[in-house]
Amino acid sequence: MDTRIKRIIAREILDSRGNPTVEVDITLNNGIRGRAACPSGASTGIHEAVERRDGEKRFGGKGVQGAVQAVMDIISPKLLGRDALEQKSIDSVMIELDGTPNKAKLGANAILTVSMAVARAAANSEDVLLSEYLGPKSTLMPVPCMNIMNGGAHANWQGSDFQEYMIAPVGAPDYPEAVRWGCEVYHSLKSVLKKKGLSTGVGDEGGFAPIVPSNLEPASLIVHAIEEAGYIPGKDIALVLDPASSGFYKDGKYTLKTEKKVLTSEEMTDYYEDMIRTYPIISIEDGLAEDDWEGFAFMTKRLGNTIQIVGDDIFVTNPERIHRGLKEKTANAVLIKLNQIGTVTETIDAIRLAQKAGWGTMVSHRSGETCDSFIADLTVALGCGQLKTGAPCRGERVEKYNQLLRINEFLGDKARYAGRQAFNSA
């Protein structure tokens, strides 16, 4: 079978927020095709690889025709005739073509989408699942961390200061049951909110986004919903937080508008410690801001033996920044987002670097998503054990959970559910 690249086509499509994004189709000489679409974040770290947007009147400046043309006019001529099975070589060519440290010239949205489409075309050509192609011996199914209450930028700052309140069915016996448990709690929470006269409208990621009096209230509501659904908080289902603290960090302080508090890094750590004592929290992501290295190290030293401390914006899936984090003991886990670094190869390198050091790895969607389920396969392939991809609501979120159900079915008796052990220090 001739797996050399014959044709590359890029186009502008819409993401889940109605904003343009890049989609790429790759056809190999054997006639096999691969398609991929790029996600986009709402709360983006300043150190992330750069999305290329047109900045013109159409789509309010968010068009991606320039990124599409970069694929067609610059990337495609250099990749035609190359073997799709040589992922690392293809990604290296695109990185060299761009020539910037953050992919600002061609755009991470152009480069990544091609990189993903190449991997999918290669997997299709080998007639295997993408997860099997990227990780032939991997059988670990992840804990689905479902974002069932939204705040911060994901809810237009109408509710909690904290961006995501997730549930993690750590006590489930397998992945399909974990999904069922999560769905039942999600529907239970909707009933709880209705009874309290709170809004059941959903945010970008499918979670509910009611106006609440404090950042603790969503956790209380979720614990109530877990109990109403017939599960034991902490034992069956734990809580996972992503405050996305860079969004309320300014001049060295953290401003919690919901509670009219202005706190230092140490005081924020105290705040989280109090939350952990009250609620069954197993993991906190971006509890402090993206450049608060000293604060992160303090928080990890203080809380890292009790819960998982995840770095997202501080690491941006970048091996160089993860290296620094390992040296300074900044966290004990890293969030993985494909479009933060911009190629499949670099993403895999970041995951393996963290795993080799004993850190936890949680793969993540973005708030502006498509129905591409690449991250579901990636999570299993690399044995990450944790995936967050929104609530069990909205098609672009549910598609990832559904793809994992298919992978679990394919693995059969070989499938192993990660459970509580996936979370560092939990």
From Swiss-Prot:
Gene3D superfamilies for this protein: Enolase-like C-terminal domain (3.20.20.120), Enolase-like, N-terminal domain (3.30.390.10)
Source superkingdom: Archaea
Protein keywords: Cytoplasm, Glycolysis, Lyase, Magnesium, Metal-binding, Secreted
Cofactor(s) the record lists: Mg(2+)
SMART domains listed in its UniProt record: Enolase_C, Enolase_N
CC terms in the record's Gene Ontology section: cell surface; extracellular region; phosphopyruvate hydratase complex
PROSITE patterns assigned to the protein according to its UniProt record, in alphabetical order: ENOLASE
Active site location: E205, K337
Residues that, per the record, bind Mg(2+): D242, E285, D312
Glycoprotein recorded as keyword: no
Catalytic reaction annotation: (2R)-2-phosphoglycerate = phosphoenolpyruvate + H2O
InterPro entries listed in its UniProt record: Enolase, Enolase-like_C_sf, Enolase-like_N, Enolase_C, Enolase_CS, Enolase_N
Cofactor binding notes: Binds a second Mg(2+) ion via substrate during catalysis.
Single Gene Ontology BP annotation: glycolytic process
Keyword Disulfide bond: no
Protein residues bound to (2R)-2-phosphoglycerate: Q163, K337, R366, S367, K388
Single annotated GO MF: magnesium ion binding
Location(s), subcellular: Cytoplasm; Secreted; Cell surface
Pathway annotation from the record: Carbohydrate degradation; glycolysis; pyruvate from D-glyceraldehyde 3-phosphate: step 4/5
HAMAP family: Enolase
Family according to the record: Belongs to the enolase family.
Name the UniProt record assigns to this protein: Enolase 2
Species of origin: Methanospirillum hungatei JF-1 (strain ATCC 27890 / DSM 864 / NBRC 100397 / JF-1)
Gene name for this UniProt entry: eno2
